Amino acid sequence: MGILSDDVVIISQSEKEGDPSVITINCPDKTGLGCDLCRILLFFGLNIVRGDVSTDGKWCYLVFWVIGKPNTRWNLLKMRLVEASPSFSWAFGISRCYLSDSESQPPKLPDLFLLKLACSDRTGLLYDVTEVLYKLEINIEKVKISTTPDGKVMDLFFVTDTRELLGTVKRRNEVYEYLRDAIGDSMISYDIELVGPEITACSTSSSVAETLFSSDVSGEHSSGLHTSSNVSIAVDNSLSSAHTLIHITCQDHKGLLYDIMRTFKDFNIQISYGRFTIKLGKNCEIDLFIVQSDGRKILDSSKLNALITRLRAELQQPLRVVMMNRGPDTELLVTNPVELSGKGRPQVFHDIALALKKIDTCIFSAEIGRHVTGDREWEVYKVLINEEDSLPIPRSKIEEEVWKTLMGWE
C-alpha cells in the first residue's frame, strides 16, 4: 500500500536563476524524517533559504524553498525524497505483522565495494574523482590514497552504491566510462571488487583525538579550531501548553537545517511545527515547537539542558578543521559527528578536495576513518599535503579555505 509519488513530493522549479525553487512534501510522519530529508537536500547541493514544517504526529507537511544549481538533477532528487518518505501504512498504525517483508524488516546494510584506481598525479585529480562518484550516487565510506616516488597515485575507495547496482557489469562499466572521461590519459588501471564491512574499521591516534575532540567550543577558537559566531538559543515552556518552543538565531551555513534535525533525531525529539528563514546578512531565525517521543513537552531540566548544549555545539562547530605538523609534513584534519543511525555527513571529502583544488594545493595521501569518543562516533578525514608540488600558501590559508568551503561561505 502506498501513495503516488507525484502526491508525496512536488517540486516547482524557479523560472529565474537565483530565485528559489519550492519543494513540497506531504507524507506520513516519523521521528527523524526531517533529518533524512535535509540530508538528501544537502547531498544534492541545495541551499535551503526558507522552510516550514507541520505535523499532527501521524501526517506531516513540509515546504522547503531552495536555491539549486544549473546542473541540479531534479527528477533524481524527487525520487530520493519519495524513497525517504514513510509508506502510507505508517500513518494508520498498521501492525508490523500485516506489513510486507520489505516494510517489516530492518533496512539491509548496503554492500561495500573496493574501487582501486591508479593514475598519474596532477593537481585536482582527487576532486575530479570525487565529483564523478558524487554524480553517480556512489558514497565514499573510507579512502586510502598514496603517492609513489615516480608520481603515480593509488586510490583505494571503499564505497557503497545508492542505486545498489555496483555488483553488475553494466554499472561497473558506467563508472569506468565516467572516470575515464574525467581523468583522461592519466588513468592507468581500474578495478572494483566486493569486500566485507569490517574493512572500514579505523582508529585515530590519541594526539589527534585530543586536538579534535577535547576542545570546548563554547569559548574562543580553542586549539585553533574555527567556530561559527553569534549562536543564540532560547527555550520557552510557557507559550504552549503542549510544546516546548526552541528559538534559534545564528549565522547560516551549509547543512544548517540538517545539523539541527540530526540533533533532534539523535535525541528522539519530534518537531510539531517549525519555521526557518534567512534574513539579510545570512542570519537565520528558527522557531521550533517540539515534543518528546511520548508526545509531551520537555519539562525535565537535565534533558533540556543536554539538548541545548548539544544543539549549540553543533551550530557553532558542525565540522572541525585543523592543520597539524606530522614530522616535516603538514596534515589537514577534518572531522564531523556521525548520526546514531551510522550515517555520516554528505559531501565532506568532496568539499575538502574542492577547497584544495581552488588554491592549487596537492594531496600526497589521504584517509577516511571513524573514531569513537565517549558516546559519540566521528568521521575523521586525514589529508597529508604535498608542499613540494603546491604553491607556497600559508597553512592558515589552507585551513581557512577548507573551513569556508565546508561551511558554504565561498
From Swiss-Prot:
Keywords for this protein: Repeat
Has the keyword 4Fe-4S been applied to this entry? no
Classification via Gene3D superfamilies: 3.30.70.260
Q: Where is the ACT domain?
A: 22-105, 114-197, 245-324
Write down the InterPro entries for this protein, in alphabetical order.
ACR1-12, ACR2/9/10_N, ACT-like_dom_sf, ACT_ACR9/10_C, ACT_dom
Role this protein plays:
May bind amino acids.
**Protein name from the UniProt record:** ACT domain-containing protein ACR10
Q: Which organism is it from?
A: Arabidopsis thaliana (Mouse-ear cress)
Its ancestry begins with: Eukaryota, Viridiplantae, Streptophyta, Embryophyta, Tracheophyta
